């Protein structure tokens, strides 16, 4: 029978539940157990697909095309599992489903209430994931903070699950913050109150994960255990660490993995975390620093590009390179020009995005990389920007643009996909999820992947306009990846360049620690080689003494 672990948060938001859940999943998987994960988000949006990145951060796209919370990216990277749309549930989805059933008459004229109808729908979604995944353990993170009014139906649903599946098949983990005051003393009172608030909705925490910026001694653990009525072994200190990939080892060294297995009666094998320990050891080693510019629209909020950031670090780690990300606002490039902002970097990355703001800065960055031989990686919109830049400055064609930014442009080298023309709703209507791409032999993309066909995740409405394909190819643009039906250009590149590759898809969503994505691996390697070549040119000549 599937076991369930429910993870709640207290004291403050953004306390680290997502990394905690991902780390717990890693500990269980290292013991030979199959794990699936779910995020319950209490907002009324159906999904984050139409939310501003400033509000929500990155939209993570699953293989089956769901637009989900960025925490699903952490889950996939830590546990090395591909999740589905079943793994992200919002209040908006729950209420939409219940109201649709009421309109169909499924409730036979009954009065629709939060209890039981909303809570039953929540439990049904959790059960669907368990049945679909057939996982030994399903870990469910409840978004928000205990005490938020939006979270109450979810808390009530997971309270009811204790009776539905049996007390021995459930664990409740509460993640809290231990703040410290000017004297340096860690304060436990907020955690005590948070545990009490959880009890007020009928849930008693089995395990307390205590976040803090400084060490938590045994006296504090015993105090929390006393007030929370848990075993002192169940009070787990989680100090702030240099890398999120250290967290599974912190939890393992505190005995959490064995404690979970013991409490849930899981048929686990001894933990195998040797590869993970080797990964963390590589993270701690001194590495050559390579500056890479990320030119984007939302650079003030790094979480808007979290999968891109992690994919860069995965590739750097494999090659003993410390990626020094230079966050460059595309609007700044428009105002000040690319030369001043990009002259000190050895790689330029333009990630995905939407909207006209900053677009000319992204196009200028793509062209600057082309002219100056700086390795370039374009993702989704970054590929479209590279195409526009090439058409403008290599072909010398005037009034070139995407119809997203100028519907009346004379030369729409990027245009709305035909099947998008009659769509009026924004949410969930793009080309989303995993699609195949055929790679052209003899190209950088083919060499990077080492195969003829790949499958990658997409999120876009606009595409390369095939009306311009022949003229662009004649001018030197290489189409190195294309859909099997030959209609959609997936990858473009340049031949006589250290690395100039751009994809319509989002390779960052499939990068993993220890298994970097091939395009990021190639990009980072080219950036490092460019740095080394530059250093070699600057070395002083040494006269021979012979």
From Swiss-Prot:
Its EC number is 6.3.4.2. One of its GO terms (molecular function) is metal ion binding. Keywords: ATP-binding, Glutamine amidotransferase, Ligase, Magnesium, Metal-binding, Nucleotide-binding, Pyrimidine biosynthesis. The active site is at 380 (nucleophile), 506, 508. GO terms for cellular component: cytosol. It catalyses: UTP + L-glutamine + ATP + H2O = CTP + L-glutamate + ADP + phosphate + 2 H(+); L-glutamine + H2O = L-glutamate + NH4(+); UTP + NH4(+) + ATP = CTP + ADP + phosphate + 2 H(+). Belongs to the CTP synthase family. Catalyzes the ATP-dependent amination of UTP to CTP with either L-glutamine or ammonia as the source of nitrogen. Regulates intracellular CTP levels through interactions with the four ribonucleotide triphosphates. This is CTP synthase. The gene is pyrG.
């Amino acid at each position: 029978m599937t076991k369930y672990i429910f993870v709640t948060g207290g004291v403050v938001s953004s306390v680290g539940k997502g990394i905690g859940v991902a780390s717990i999943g890693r500990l269980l998987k290292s013991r030979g157990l199959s794990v699936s994960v779910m995020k319950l988000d209490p907002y009324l949006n159906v999904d984050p697909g139409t939310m501003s990145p400033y509000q929500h951060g990155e939209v993570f796209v699953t293989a089956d095309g769901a637009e989900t919370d960025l925490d699903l990216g952490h889950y996939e990277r830590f546990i090395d599992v591909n999740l589905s749309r079943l793994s992200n549930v919002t209040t908006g989805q729950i209420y939409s489903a219940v109201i649709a059933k009421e309109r169909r008459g499924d409730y036979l004229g009954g009065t629709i209430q939060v209890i039981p109808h909303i809570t039953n729908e929540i439990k049904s979604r959790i059960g669907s994931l368990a049945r679909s995944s057939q996982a030994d353990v399903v870990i469910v993170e409840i978004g928000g903070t205990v005490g938020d009014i939006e979270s109450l139906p979810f808390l009530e649903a997971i309270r009811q699950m204790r009776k539905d599946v049996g007390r021995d098949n459930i664990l409740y983990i509460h993640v809290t913050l231990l703040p410290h005051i000017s004297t340096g003393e860690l304060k436990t009172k907020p955690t005590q109150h948070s545990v009490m608030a959880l009890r007020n909705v009928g849930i008693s925490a089995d395990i307390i994960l205590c976040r803090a910026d400084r060490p938590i001694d045994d006296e504090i653990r015993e105090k929390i255990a006393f007030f929370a009525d848990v075993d002192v072994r169940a009070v787990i200190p989680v100090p702030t660490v240099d890398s999120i990939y250290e967290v599974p080892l912190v939890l393992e060294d505190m005995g959490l993995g064995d404690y979970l297995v013991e409490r849930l009666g899981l048929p686990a094998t001894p933990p195998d975390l040797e590869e993970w320990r080797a990964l963390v050891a590589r993270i701690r080693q001194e590495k050559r620093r390579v500056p890479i510019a990320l030119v984007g629209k939302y650079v003030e909020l790094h979480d808007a590009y979290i999968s891109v950031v992690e994919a860069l670090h995965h590739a750097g780690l494999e090659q003993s390179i410390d990626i020094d990300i230079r966050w460059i606002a595309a609007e700044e490039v428009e105002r000040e020009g690319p030369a001043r902002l990009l002259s000190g970097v050895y790689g330029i990355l333009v990630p995905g995005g939407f909207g006209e703001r900053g677009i000319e800065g992204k196009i200028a960055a793509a062209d600057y990389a082309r002219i100056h031989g700086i390795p370039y990686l374009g993702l989704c919109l970054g590929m479209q920007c590279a195409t526009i830049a090439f058409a403008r400055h290599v072909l010398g064609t005037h009034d070139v643009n995407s119809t997203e930014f100028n519907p009346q442009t004379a030369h729409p080298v990027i245009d709305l996909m035909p099947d998008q023309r009659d769509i009026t709703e924004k949410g969930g209507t793009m080309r989303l999820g995993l699609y195949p791409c055929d790679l052209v032999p003899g190209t950088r993309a083919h060499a990077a992947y080492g195969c003829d066909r790949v499958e990658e995740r997409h999120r876009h409405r606009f595409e390369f306009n095939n009306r311009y394909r022949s003229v662009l190819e004649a001018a030197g643009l290489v189409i190195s990846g294309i859909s099997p039906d030959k209609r959609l250009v997936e990858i473009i590149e340049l031949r006589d360049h250290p690395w100039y590759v751009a994809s319509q898809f989002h390779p960052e969503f499939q990068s993993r620690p220890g298994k970097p994505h091939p395009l990021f691996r190639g990009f980072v390697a080219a950036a490092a080689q460019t740095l080394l070549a530059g250093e070699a040119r600057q070395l002083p000549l040494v006269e021979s003494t012979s």
